[in-house]
Regions:
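Helix-to-loop junction immediately C-terminal to a conserved catalytic motif
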Residues: 53
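Conserved ABC ATPase "signature" region
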Residues: 69, 117-135, 187
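Conserved ABC transporter NBD signature motif
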Residues: 61-69
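A short, proline-enriched helix->beta-strand linker immediately N-terminal to the Walker B motif
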Residues: 159-163
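Conserved ABC ATPase signature
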Residues: 140-144, 148
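Helical segment within the ABC ATPase nucleotide-binding domain
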Residues: 180-196
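Catalytic Walker B motif of ABC-type/P-loop ATPase nucleotide-binding domains
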Residues: 165-168
Length: 248
């Protein structure tokens, strides 16, 4: 039985004027695994992420998510399709004036027809699932530690039961203890939701943190995929760019 593909990037090129940002990218991200897109700053990672989310259209080629060519969808269809994605950014991007529970409730109020009582119960379950205890439900982000804010952001990302969870630089700038906490959280979340189908994508330049938890790695340099392999193969790569990156 062939492996299910979550995302297929087929001959994707992106130009802004004469500037080539992505250059004939070809790779596939398997479903129900953790795949990290690594690269130096300016490699094109953020531009690639925007293509995966349908926020940018390629100059050439196509991006498909679970077999659906994003280039065939209009803006309303794309907006609906993005509900397949949950996101956690480098900074949790919480609403400062909303409590932890209200932050998690936001997408449920925006995109579902659940009753207030149902939303509240779902938010409680989500917060508990990421180890935020009840005494913190009504705290503002300013009253939470950095690690707890990450957890609230993850709970919000999971609110709409996404098929794909996308983490953008989740460990950048964190101390080793918090980095381990975030990595454990990513793995625990992937394992917890694996049965119903969850694909994890990490965008990062933190090679040490991400190799510990990934199944596959795509290494991007100046808009080109230099290496796409399992983590084990990536560590043993003879490519000088890969070795330079690993040994930074």
């Amino acid at each position: 039985m062939s492996e299910e593909i979550a995302i297929a990037v087929e001959d994707v090129t992106k130009k802004f004027g004469e500037l080539v940002i992505l250059n004939h990218l070809n790779f596939k991200i398997p479903a129900n695994k953790i795949t990290t897109i690594l690269g130096f700053s300016g490699a094109g990672k953020s531009t690639l992420m925007k293509h995966i989310l349908g926020l940018l259209k390629p100059t050439h080629g196509k991006v498909s998510v679970f077999g659906k060519d994003l280039g065939t969808l209009d803006e309303m269809e794309l907006r609906e399709f993005r509900r397949n994605f949950g996101m956690l950014f480098q900074y949790a991007a919480l609403f400062d004036s909303k409590t932890a529970l209200e932050n998690v409730a936001f997408p449920l109020r925006e995109f579902t027809k659940l009753k207030d009582s149902e939303i509240r119960e779902k938010c409680k379950d989500l917060l508990l699932s990421v180890n935020i205890q009840e005494e913190s439900f009504n705290k503002l982000p300013s009253e939470l530690s950095g690690g707890m804010r990450k957890r609230v952001g993850l709970a919000r990302g999971l609110a709409l039961s996404p098929k794909i969870m996308l983490y953008d630089e989740p460990t950048t700038g964190l101390d080793p203890i918090t980095t381990k906490m975030v990595n454990d959280l990513i793995v625990d979340t992937q394992n917890k939701y694996a049965e119903r189908g969850m694909t994890t994508i990490i965008i990062s330049h933190d090679v040490r943190a991400t190799l510990e938890i990934s199944d596959f790695v795509a290494f991007l340099d100046r808009g080109t995929i230099v290496e796409y392999s399992t983590v084990e193969e990536f560590r043993l790569s003879k490519n000088p760019l890969v070795q330079e990156f690993i040994n930074l």
